[in-house]
C-alpha cells in the first residue's frame, strides 16, 4: 500500500469511526429506555423475586414445608369496568342495592365509590407448580390471587409498594383466560430463541469467512 492509498484509507476511517460510535451510542440509549419501561414495579429480576416471596408466604401460611417452586406465571387481572357490558351490569347492581336498602344521596355516593374502588384494585393471578424437595413428587398446578397496593410512608416521598395474598382461586375458571396468555408468552420466547440462533449462525459464518480470507491477505503482503 503506497502513501496515497494509506492517506485515503485513514481519511475514510476518520469519517466512518465517528458514525459507528454515534450508532452504538443511540442504540444503547434506546435499549436503556426500553429497560426503564419493561414493566411495573421495578426490573424483571425484582418482580421475579416478588412472585417467589409471595408464593413462599402462601405455602408457609398453608403449613406446606419443604416445597420447591418449579414453575410460575403471573397474569394481571383486567379491570372489569373497562368493559362496557360489565360496567353496565355493575351500575345496575349498585342501583339495585341502593334501592333495596333505601340509601340516602350521600350514603349512596359513598357506597358506589367504595365498590368502584374495589373493582379498580390492581389484582394479579399467580399460577405456580411446586414439588416436594425430598420425594420430588410434583403437585398439581395452583392459582392464587394477590393485590398490589400502595401504602403512604412518613419518611419516603413515594408510597411503599406492598402485596396482599387474597387466597386460592378456582383453577379451571381462571385458566380460561390465563391459558391464552401463557401460550402467547411461550410463542414469544420461541421467536426470541430463534432470533438468537439465527444471529449466532450469522456471526459464526462471518468468523469462518474471515479465517479463510486471512491466509490470502498474508500471501499478497509477502509478494509486495
Swiss-Prot record:
Name the UniProt record assigns to this protein: Uncharacterized protein MG364
UniProt cross-references to Pfam families, sorted A to Z: DUF5385
Organism: Mycoplasma genitalium (strain ATCC 33530 / DSM 19775 / NCTC 10195 / G37)
Residue ranges with Basic residues bias: 204-214
Source species, domain of life: Bacteria
UniProt region (Disordered), positions on chain: 203-224
InterPro entries: DUF5385
Basic and acidic residues compositional bias, start-end: 215-224
